[in-house]
Curated annotation (Swiss-Prot):
UniProt GO BP: one-carbon metabolic process; tetrahydrobiopterin biosynthetic process; tetrahydrofolate biosynthetic process
Enzyme class, spelled out: hydrolase
Family assignment from sequence similarity: Belongs to the GTP cyclohydrolase I family.
Protein keywords: GTP-binding, Hydrolase, Metal-binding, Nucleotide-binding, One-carbon metabolism, Zinc
Statement: the UniProt record of this protein carries the keyword Zinc: yes
One MF term in the entry's GO annotations: GTP binding
The protein's name: GTP cyclohydrolase 1
Family annotation (InterPro entries): GTP-CH-I_C/QueF, GTP-CH-I_N, GTP_CycHdrlase_I, GTP_CycHdrlase_I_CS, GTP_CycHdrlase_I_dom
Enzyme Commission (EC) number: 3.5.4.16
Length: 187
């Protein structure tokens, strides 16, 4: 799927365009390293993250399940600069249909490892859980620092963006949503 020689050629052209010598010591292997790095950090493009939710377990549990602080990194599709943060995922299983906790982390990372927008990432995670697990409801909160804001433009290091996606009972029931959000945001 990845055209590594094409990526190498593009990186070499960028180095030349900024006035660097891509053949000098220290840079001569950079195009190949960047190509391999892109293959790794964009690995989510070659998978369907929803498939991680394919295996479920029957468990008599119809209360909140929350996995907090799922570390993530992604690449802002506007600047191809990383955003780094964490996702918090909460759902209420329906009919005891639960998934493995690690599957939620795999889902998050599958969607994060591609050119992405934080808003879309948050929505994709919530929608995949609703589709594959059919829970009573889902809340997803993503907090991240965007290096495109930290390193360039406004240059505001440490600023965090928080996005949320709320589905099912959490959208309809204010008390349930408030409980989920308080548990998610509690340190």
């Amino acid at each position: 799927m990845f055209d590594l020689p094409k990526i190498e050629k593009a990186v070499k052209m960028i180095l030349e365009a900024i006035g660097e010598d891509p053949n000098r010591e220290g840079l001569e292997e950079t195009p190949a390293r960047v190509a391999r790095m892109y293959q790794e950090i964009f690995a989510g493009l070659g998978e369907d993250p929803e498939e991680h939710l394919g295996k479920t377990f029957s468990e008599e549990h119809e209360e909140m399940v929350i996995v907090k602080d799922i570390r993530l990194f992604s690449m802002c599709e506007h600047h191809l600069i990383p955003f780094i943060g964490k996702a918090h995922v909460c759902y209420i299983p329906r009919n005891g249909n639960v998934t493995g906790l690690s599957k939620l982390a795999r889902l998050v990372n599958g969607y994060a490892r591609r050119p992405q927008l934080q808003e879309r990432l948050t929505k994709q995670i919530a929608d995949a859980i609703m589709k594959r697990l059919n829970p009573y409801g889902v809340v997803v909160v993503v907090e991240a620092e965007h290096l495109c804001m930290s390193m360039r433009g406004v240059r505001s290091p440490g600023a965090r963006t928080v996005t949320s996606a709320v589905r099912g009972i959490f959208k309809k029931n204010e008390a349930s949503r408030a409980e989920a959000m308080s548990l998610i945001m509690k340190s």
